[in-house]
UniProtKB/Swiss-Prot annotation:
Taxonomic superkingdom: Eukaryota
Pfam families: Tet_JBP, zf-CXXC
Protein known as: Methylcytosine dioxygenase tet3
GO MF terms, alphabetically ordered: 5-methylcytosine dioxygenase activity; methyl-CpG binding; RNA polymerase II cis-regulatory region sequence-specific DNA binding; zinc ion binding
Zinc finger (CXXC-type): 58-99
Binding of Zn(2+) 2, residues: C77, C80, C83, C93, H1204
Predominant subcellular localization, coarse grouping: nucleus
Function: Dioxygenase that catalyzes the conversion of the modified genomic base 5-methylcytosine (5mC) into 5-hydroxymethylcytosine (5hmC) and plays a key role in epigenetic chromatin reprogramming during embryonic development. Conversion of 5mC into 5hmC probably constitutes the first step in cytosine demethylation. Selectively binds to the promoter region of target genes and contributes to regulate the expression of numerous developmental genes, including pax6, rax, sox9 and six3. May also contribute to the regulation of target genes in ways that do not require its enzyme activity.
The enzyme's E.C. designation: 1.14.11.80
């Protein structure tokens, strides 16, 4: 492996923020980044050289390049970890980190004494990586040897690799070395893998070693040796020299002399680590990373130098290897590599760096975590490393320690090592992981690696510093140096008969190492290994050392590590045996079998990992799942402060990190290898399926990014492993969850061992292979230190697992072997009491055997969770184990079920308790049925609260203990934020592209006190206006109280004054106004009213009142999705009726506007824009716009609509609303305030007293110039409703209730002839001439009733439809459907029944069947025909030929009914009919009837009575208010006092109710109108006048409300009543009609009066009325009420166009516009015209009410900042979070709006393709199935469900209702005829039925 001094970017951080908190780690990292040459990639000489160069680099702080994008970035992103944790993090924003600084400094290290061959800066060459499988054990030996003596190129290569890794870590990119390492790791074992394995092993070992050192140093917290001394200065000078030389790429040069004594170097290192930097150090931060790295490398070099003696530091292993006929060169290379890797690169894997940065933990901790991860993930490969295994462990005792802790801390980070390499070296890695676990540094490294989250091979990952450090470590007895340990290991290796047979050496070594492993893991697996070299003693010492070591300073730790070389050697021996065993597991079945024996022994020593290897392969995955996060977290934090740091980051990790280990870590390679030993075939199968399955499962269960790792095991797993590690470490609490996942993974592995290849790939990609190999060696060395540390950690983890799974829950060692086919693993778990938990020993092996599990939770291997995982793996491998893992896969779901049997072998019920939450006997089916049962509570909590992810995760800070939005206001940053107002200006200038006056910043202060009028309506206290044309952009910013962080100032509103071109705005204003005014369907919005629902801010005139129209996709609560879920051809811009052209035009306008607004939105608020387009591809159907980049799903057009203070709660949580404003022509000039304008208000804010620059004078200047308009209390007109507007729900309930009552009454009438008789008696009064008309009427009724009724019905529905609320619904039953609508409450009102007369005691008069022989009924229709041709045209056109007969009958009847009573009744009825005819298409005809009535009042009278009934019927649909309004108008206008009196007397109280609902008496009155018209002609004439609302309309207008309580109407009613003999009838109907008329007349604001006025004229234009019959129904009824007002009928017809009927004037124009407005009652007043009328009456009173809202101005803290949007402006705000409103206009007129607000928004849930049709269909299918089931059940029970459904639906449904009673009533239709002629009862029942039906019967009548 030739050293390629590729230029490495300067590693030294320009900004402290660029590097992890652990400067030492950084330094090491940088060293690792440097080429092997720089790192001293070989012997101590190289290290020294590198040290020389490093000092040079560190002396000179690298500067930011100033040209890259990050350097040019001025503002911190505010979202990265460094920004979020600004108070604790000393690193610069990641987005601002210089690209050059990210790159590691190129430190060419020429003089690599030990490793003459340099390694590529970016890692070993592909050929190097691919040269062969890496024998981690051998590599470990070689590294140790290399540290001590070998100047082999392997060391250089390792150094280079380390540098590459460091570089890659720093750059967050995998070093080129990864693929190679992966390849090497992928290969099981190749004896001749010196170079490649060296690099890989070196990487892994370096990582482990460094992690161990880092962990030890961080954990022990060695006190700094002291302040920098002259020696330190000398060292620093030399470091600078070497650094500079490294940068230059040459090691040449005269390095300043410096003491190279190991103790001196250690002391300097300790000092440097504790913040003592040389005087000339210019590095940011407490430590000089480069210097630390250099020192470590120097130490390593020194150690290596001492070892370089033939085998001084190679130690026993190297010597033994050489003595044992190992090629010296190979041994040296291996040792060099080992030493190199641990010394420099190990600490600075990208994963560790990333972890350190992201988790805000020290680099040491991160490295330790990473090392643990890699160790756990990189299991020793028995075959690959068997020959060299003994050497490597011995070689890299320190490295192993480092790696081992790192594995312990970060099993996930282990993945960074190339997965291939890991797989190749899994066994070694496994050993390493176990051995490394104790080492505290490794966790640091792991953490760091995790932070980097980039897959790197261990070699790449390990900085050159690690190699030096490894050399240093070996030199120190305390730290099991590779040489010593290697020697010991080599002694064991002697047992290993040849380097090619590392298994033998491992077995020999395992004699002692087993004991160590046991002690560390406390698992049964470790017990078998107790036999090994010095395991127990070493372990104990290691524990102690680990504890002490953690307490020691880094230097002390290093020294101690060096001192404990013996222990480490023993440990290495054990670990090597363990690794060897694992290698066997991973080796071919034969090899695995051979290794199994050996591995059992060495596995025992490395039982922490070794037993895990076999047992872990399957169980490891489970462990990973359960414990990865928890175990790692717990273990890492517990062992050392780094872990604590990880814990600190846990919450974040929990948020963003998956509970499970990274996929790479979760890889099943270890498992697979174990199975390979047992069953390679099985492993192959499992590997193929398990890794993906496991990953999938993990992804599913933990929502981890396992998919990536699955897809690319090498790269993704590595990355994922690191990420997972970070997440897991940060989320130790999740470790248990992850452990569960790990168990599952283990189950997968056990079940499917095919995943091994992928697992290997994963490990390779993660770079864990090398690390694993190195870790294996390291773990052997750390067996003592690391094992001791790990032992403590593992004990903690074990306790955790015991708490979860039970202390005794452990798999017997044999259990694992049974699965693995390895007796030793079984023995180990069973034999080693330490492995009580199923995972302890298995954890590490699973890491090796099951990379996913291991990678997922390296900590698990170290933790009880790891042990438990190991035990689980054992269970997996052996049915004996109480927790056997069962792997079931179905598609992408793989369920690893651990049979939590309290089996004898598993021994302890305690093991099960851990899984108490899990199903006792998990299965795939069980998982599919209830996946949550398989998750631990923390995992469930994560899954159960995904909504939080949906919530904006805004940056946090430490400015305040807890953000209290009530005090500081809503907190969000997606509009923009910064530390100061000036930063906001810079930000907006950058976005907008202009500076200076073009951008205006206004500060506002959040008060939390809402400014509103006394009525609760919006007001403004300050108005921000555009100052000049130069001002292009205005931003409102809020200073967050108590904050001084990066997000102390946030943007709350952005106003682009020229958002769209002026020409576009003008055309849009015209087009939208014309289209929407005519065809728009207003939307009822809660914000249109105040809290009391009593304000009339939208205006009192329904024809001009402000309205809101919705277009595009919106949420439907019915569909629980987009309202177009069922629409095959959605009409997003639907208008009333069929108007495709208008809809297309509107669509084009809005789509084009959305397309043009989106870029502006993107420019001004890029983050919010991006949030809204994230799901564009998925839900493109629910998006507006013609081009890519569609942030909006819907648009609301508000035309003079006053929106009361509200928040758009259903908008996208992290999105904004974009409001495009179009203003009237007189409000388009800058600097001129229009007479009437609408403002956008923020009621909770007040204006700051200073401008953006903090100047009060500047603010005053703005006020003077008009930029800020300060308002004061001034009188404002208060528009108030007479009664609170009903909500849609209330209206529906009332409508249903009324319908139910009517139906009930109908039924009663049908059943009881008494009522019918009463009605007939009354009718008799009206029916003075019943004979002919009745007969004729019968046939006519028979024929026409359905048609006419349908017409009427349509009319009533039409009225309903006219209201936007109603839409196109035209319920047949006014009681049911119409009543549901607020505007059609008339139909639902009791008045309707009373109008029909059947419900009320006066039911007869309306139909006139009883009193008058069908005359009243027929006359209504036929009178329309007979009275006047025009009327005939109306009603007769609809009527059959018999209608003319009816007309003639009516005429005759009218004549016959010459009596006053008949006339009065006729008049009343005619009035009523007129009203009804206005309401109905027939009402137009009935309008004609009134006209006819005028000429022939007598004739009309009988028919008018009928019409009155019709009117009443229509009145039902139109709701009595119409009739009442017309009648009232008539009463006002009518000259016949009798009629008016009768109407008034009974009608006023009756007809006028809240919301115009008529009382039953009102109903009676409605009926009485027949009598009203029945009186004599004069009454009829008066009635004409009465109907002649047009003539009297003005008066009615003025007194429109009075009929509600006005004397005029009363008088008129009184006169009518006096004239009408049948007061009951006349009073009922006449009063209704009179009441209706007066109100309508006076309420010409309501379309009804206008229609009355125009009704007479409209009669002629009945066709028009019919076209919009429903609109004109109410009006036409009113109009019909005034027969004399035919001229007004024409307007009425227009009114029909817009059912807004109530107009100030009956004029056609006003009627037309008003009618539409009338149609739509923004206040739901349409429920009854009476309400509208009464409202208008009160409005007059209210108009006199004024308010100055003085209380708002007395308190300066009451908010009310308003912005005056200009024509074409675009306003952007977070409407979901900010309370906002729009002020009411003085004179709203949506026909010519003062302001049109086009509000573009995106609903939070409109993210389904095809409008969510699939979801809807699924829902419907489910409902259908349920219905079918209910039907089946009902059939079984003999219940008729249909009846029930009919009962409900028909009860409320118009059609259904009609069907049930109406069907019967329809049957009675003939009866009705007969009843009409013959009996009241029969007639009543029939007519009532039709009455209920409302349509057909009424029409015919």
């Amino acid at each position: 492996m030739d050293t390629q001094p590729a230029p490495v970017p300067h590693v030294l951080p320009q900004d402290v923020y660029e590097f992890p908190d652990d400067q030492e780690s950084l330094g090491r990292l940088r060293v690792s980044e440097m080429p092997a040459e720089l790192n001293g990639g070989g012997g101590g000489g190289s290290a020294a050289a590198f040290a020389m160069e490093l000092p040079e680099q560190s002396n000179k702080k690298r500067k930011r390049c100033g040209v890259c994008v990050p350097c040019l970035r001025k503002e911190p992103c505010g979202a990265c970890y460094n920004c979020v944790n600004r108070s604790t993090s000393h690193q610069i924003c990641k987005m601002r980190k210089c690209e050059q600084l990210k790159k590691k400094r190129v430190v060419p290290m020429k003089g690599v004494e030990n490793c003459s061959e340099s390694i590529l800066v970016d890692g070993p060459k592909t050929d190097q990586m691919e040269a062969g499988p890496v024998n981690h054990v051998q590599e470990g030996r070689l590294k140790q040897e290399c540290d001590s003596t070998l100047p082999s190129k392997g060391c250089e290569d390792l150094a280079n690799q380390l540098l590459m890794e460091a570089n890659s870590w720093l750059s967050n990119t995998a070093a080129p070395q990864d693929p190679c390492n992966k390849l090497n790791w992928d290969k099981p074992t190749i004896p001749n893998h010196a170079a490649n394995n060296n690099s890989n092993l070196e990487d892994a070992k370096n990582l482990v070693a460094f992690s161990a050192v880092a962990e030890a140093m961080s954990t022990y917290g060695m006190p700094a040796s002291g302040t920098p001394s002259s020696v330190s200065l000398q060292l620093y000078e030399k470091f600078n020299y070497e650094t500079n030389r490294d940068n230059s790429g040459h090691l040449e040069g005269n390095a300043p002399s410096c003491p190279e004594d190991l103790n001196t170097l250690k002391a300097a290192l300790a000092l440097a680590k504790h913040g003592v930097k040389p005087p000339n150090c210019n590095c940011d931060g407490p430590e000089c990373p480069d210097y630390l790295e250099w020192l470590e490398n120097k130490i390593k070099s020194t150690v290596k130098g001492s070892q370089e003696s033939p085998f001084p530091n190679l130690g026993q292993v190297s010597k033994e290897l050489v003595q044992k006929q190992y090629p010296k060169e190979q041994v040296l290379n291996l040792e060099n590599k080992n030493s190199t890797c641990p010394s420099g690169n190990l600490p600075f894997s990208q994963n560790a760096l990333s972890l350190a940065k992201e988790k805000n933990i020290s680099l040491q901790t991160a490295i330790a975590i990473e090392a643990l991860t890699q160790l756990s993930s990189a299991l020793p490969q028995t075959n690959n490393e068997c020959p060299n295994a003994p050497s490597q462990p011995l070689i890299n005792p320190h490295d192993q320690l480092t790696h081992f802790p790192s594995a312990k801390g970060n099993q996930l980070p282990m993945l960074p090592v190339a997965r291939n390499e890991l797989f190749q070296n899994q066994q070694s890695q496994l050993y390493t992981g176990k051995n490394a676990l104790p080492v505290p540094q490794s966790p640091r490294q792991t953490s760091w690696e995790q932070n980097k989250k980039s897959s790197y091979q261990e070699g790449q990952y390990i900085p050159e510093n690690l190699s030096h450090s490894s050399s240093v470590l070996p030199s120190d007895a305390s730290t099991p140096q590779k040489p010593e340990f290697l020697q010991q290991w080599v002694q064991n290796a002697d047992l290993l008969k040849s380097p090619s047979d590392p298994m033998t050496g491992l077995k020999q070594l395992l004699g002692n190492t087993d004991e160590y492993i046991k002690s560390v893991f406390k698992g049964p697996e470790a017990l078998p290994n107790k036999k090994n070299v010095k395991p127990k003693h070493t372990i104990k010492s290691i524990k102690k050392e680990s504890t002490e070591f953690l307490k020691m300073s880094p230097d002390q730790q290093l020294s101690q590590l060096l001192q404990t070389n013996e222990f480490h050697r023993n440990t290495q021996a054990a670990l090597q045996q363990h690794l060897h065993h694992k290698r066997n597991l991973f080796v071919d079945p034969n090899a695995m079998e051979a290794c199994t024996q050996e591995q059992q022994n060495w596995w025992v020593p490395s039982s922490q990992q070794a037993p895990v290897s076999k047992t872990t392969e399957k169980p490891v995955k489970e462990r990973k799942k359960r414990r990865q996060s928890p175990s790692q977290k717990q273990v890492e934090p517990k062992p050392k402060p780094q872990r604590k740091q990880v814990q600190i980051k846990k919450p974040k990790v929990k948020e963003g990190s998956a509970v499970f280990m990274p996929v790479s870590q979760i890889s099943l390679d270890t498992f697979r290898r174990v199975e390979k030993e047992e069953n390679q075939g099985k492993e192959m199968d499992a590997e193929n399926s398990l890794p993906n399955n496991v990953q999938t499962e993990l992804l599913e269960s933990q929502s981890l990014q396992l998919t990536g790792s699955q897809a690319n095991p090498d790269d993704r797993k590595t990355v994922n492993t690191q990420e997972m590690c970070n997440e897991n470490q940060s989320n130790i609490g999740k470790a248990n969850n992850f452990a569960l996942c790990v168990n599952r993974a283990n189950s997968f592995v056990a079940k499917d061992q095919c995943p091994t290849p992928s697992t290997h790939d994963t490990s390779s990609s993660s770079g864990q292979g090398d690390s694993a190999n190195q870790h294996t060696n390291v773990s052997d060395v750390p067996g003592q230190n690391d094992l001791s540390c790990l032992d403590d950690k593992l004990e903690d983890l074990i306790r955790q697992f015991e708490a979860e799974f039970g202390e005794d829950f452990s798999l017997p060692g044999s259990a694992v072997p049974s699965q693995n086919g390895e007796g030793p693993p079984k023995q180990t778990p069973s034999g080693d009491p330490q492995f009580k938990l199923p995972f302890p020993s298995q954890l590490l092996p699973p890491e090796n055997s099951t990379k996913p599990a291991t990678h997922s939770n390296p900590a698990l291997s170290n933790n009880p969770v790891s042990r438990e995982v190991s035990n689980n793996l054992d269970s997996l491998f052996s049915s004996k184990s109480p927790k056997q893992i069962k792997i079931e896969s179905s598609g992408a779901i793989t369920v690893v079920s651990t049979t939590c049997f309290y089996s004898e072998e598993n021994q302890h019920l305690d093991g099960t308790p851990t899984k108490s939450d899990l199903p006792f006997n998990p299965t795939l089916s069980g998982f599919l049925d209830s996946p949550l049962k398989y998750l631990t509570s923390p995992t469930k909590s994560l899954i159960d609260t995904p909504a939080k992810k949906a919530q904006a995760e805004f940056p946090t800070c430490d400015c305040v203990e807890q953000i209290n939005e009530k005090d500081e206001g809503p907190y969000y940053t997606h509009l923009g934020s910064g530390p100061t107002v000036a930063s906001i200006r810079e930000l907006m200038e950058e976005r907008f592209g202009q500076k200076g006056d073009a951008i205006r910043i206004e500060k506002v202060i959040y008060t939390g006190k809402e400014g509103k009028s006394s009525r609760g309506c919006p007001i403004a206290k300050w108005v921000i206006r555009r100052q000049s044309e130069d001002e292009k952009l205005m931003c409102l910013v809020r200073q967050r109280a108590g904050h001084h962080c990066e997000n102390a100032v946030i943007i709350i509103l952005i106003m682009a004054w020229e958002g769209i071109p002026r020409s576009l705005g003008d055309s849009l204003y015209n087009d939208i106004t014309e289209t929407i005014t005519k065809y728009g369907n207003p939307t009822s919005r809660r914000c249109g009213l105040n809290d009391d629902r009593t304000c009339a801010c939208q205006g009192k005139d329904p024809n001009t009142c402000g309205a809101s129209f919705s277009f595009g996709c919106s949420w439907s609560m019915y569909f629980n999705g987009c309202k177009y879920a069922r629409s095959k051809t959605p009409r997003k811009f639907r208008l009333i009726g069929e108007n495709p052209k208008e809809e297309d035009g509107l669509k084009d306008n809005f789509q084009n506007l959305a397309t043009k607004v989106a870029p502006v939105y993107k420019m001004l608020a890029p983050q919010a824009y991006q949030n809204q387009v994230n799901n564009e591809d998925i839900a493109i159907d629910c998006r507006l716009g013609l081009k890519e980049g569609r942030p909006f799903s819907g648009v609301t057009a508000c035309m003079d609509f006053c929106a009361h203070a509200h928040k758009d709660q259903h908008n996208l949580y992290n999105g904004c609303t974009v409001v495009c404003t179009l203003t009237k022509e007189d409000n388009r000039m800058i600097g001129r305030v229009a007479e009437d304008e609408q403002l956008h208000v923020l009621p909770l804010y007040k204006v700051s007293t200073t401008d953006e620059f903090g100047s009060e004078e500047g603010q005053l200047e703005k006020i003077k110039k008009g930029g800020i308009h300060v308002l004061s209390s001034f009188p404002r007109e208060v528009r108030k409703l007479s009664e609170p507007a009903k909500s849609c729900r209330q209206r529906q309930l009332e409508a249903k209730k009324a319908a139910a009552e009517k139906k009930k009454l109908q039924k009663e009438k049908l059943v009881s002839p008494d009522k019918t008789k009463q009605e007939p008696s009354d009718k008799k009064t009206c029916q003075q001439n019943p004979g002919v008309p009745q007969q004729q009427t019968k046939p006519c009724i028979k024929v026409e009733p359905s048609n006419h009724y349908n017409n009427f019905k349509y009319n009533g529905n039409g009225v309903v439809e006219s209201y936007s609320v109603l839409g196109s619904c035209r319920p047949s039953d006014p009681y049911s459907m119409n009543s549901v609508y607020s505007y059609h409450s008339f139909y639902a009102q009791p008045n309707l029944p009373s109008v029909n007369g059947f419900h009320s005691k006066y039911a007869l008069p309306p139909f006139g069947f009883y009193g008058f022989p069908n005359n009243p009924v027929v006359p209504n229709q036929f009178m329309n025909y007979g009275t006047s041709d025009a009327r005939n045209s109306g009603w007769m056109n609809n009527c059959f030929e018999k209608k003319p007969e009816l007309q003639s009958l009516a005429d005759g009847m009218n004549q016959s009914y010459g009596s006053e009573l008949s006339e009065q009744s006729f008049r009343r009825s005619s009035e009523v009919p007129h009203h009804y005819s206005l309401q109905n298409p027939s009402s137009q005809k009935s309008v004609n009837v009134p006209h006819r009535t005028t000429p022939a009042p007598v004739e009309t009278t009988p028919y008018s009575n009928l019409p009155c009934y019709n009117k009443v019927i229509k009145k039902e649909p139109g709701s009595d208010p119409l009739v009442d309004s017309f009648q009232r108008a008539n009463s006002v206008h009518s000259h016949s006092p009798g009629v008016n009196h009768s109407l008034q007397a009974s009608d006023l109280p009756i007809s006028y109710k809240a919301n115009g609902a008529l009382s039953s008496s009102g109903r009676t009155n409605a009926e009485s109108p027949c009598s009203m018209f029945m009186p004599n002609d004069k009454n009829g004439l008066e009635k004409k006048d009465y109907f002649g609302v047009h003539s009297n309309a003005p008066g009615l207008k003025d007194k429109q409300w009075p009929p509600y309580g006005t004397d005029v109407s009363v008088r008129q009613h009184d006169s009518l009543d006096s004239q009408s003999p049948g007061k009951v009838w006349s009073s009922c109907k006449l009063s209704d009609s009179s009441a209706a008329l007066p109100s309508s007349a006076s309420t010409q604001d309501k379309n009804w009066n206008g229609r009355q006025v125009s009704l007479n004229q409209g009669m002629k234009e009945s066709a028009l009325f019919q076209e919009k019959l429903w609109n004109s129904v109410a009006a036409s009824d009113r109009c019909s009420a005034t027969p004399s007002d035919r001229s007004s009928i024409t307007p009425c017809s227009e009114l029909q166009d817009k059912n807004w009927g109530s107009f100030p004037n009956p004029t056609v124009n006003s009627l037309k516009t008003d009618s539409s407005q009338n149609h739509w009652d923004p206040y739901s007043l349409d429920d009854n015209m009476d309400d509208g009328q009464s409202k208008s009456v009160k409005e007059e009173d209210d108009e006199e009410i004024w308010s100055d809202s003085e209380h708002n101005f007395l308190d300066e803290n009451i908010g009310g900042v308003a912005v005056a949007p200009g024509h074409g402006s675009i306003l952007i705000e977070c409407a979901r979070r900010e309370l906002h409103a729009t002020t009411p206009l003085k004179k709203p007129n949506r026909c010519h709006p003062t302001r049109i607000s086009l509000v573009f928004y995106q609903h939070k849930n409109l993210n389904q393709p095809n409008h969510g049709l699939a979801l809807w269909e699924a829902k419907m299918k489910q409902l259908a199935e349920r219905a079918r089931a209910r039907e089946e059940e009902a059939a079984k029970l003999g219940i008729k469900q249909e009846v029930k459904s009919l009962g409900k639906k028909r009860k409320w449904g118009g059609a259904a209702t009609t069907e049930t009673p109406p069907v019967e009533k329809k049957d009675y239709t003939p009866t009705r005829q007969a009843a009409t002629i013959l009996t009241d009862s029969a007639t009543t029942s029939f007519s009532y039925a039709y009455t209920k039906v409302t349509g057909p019967y009424s029409r015919f009548i």
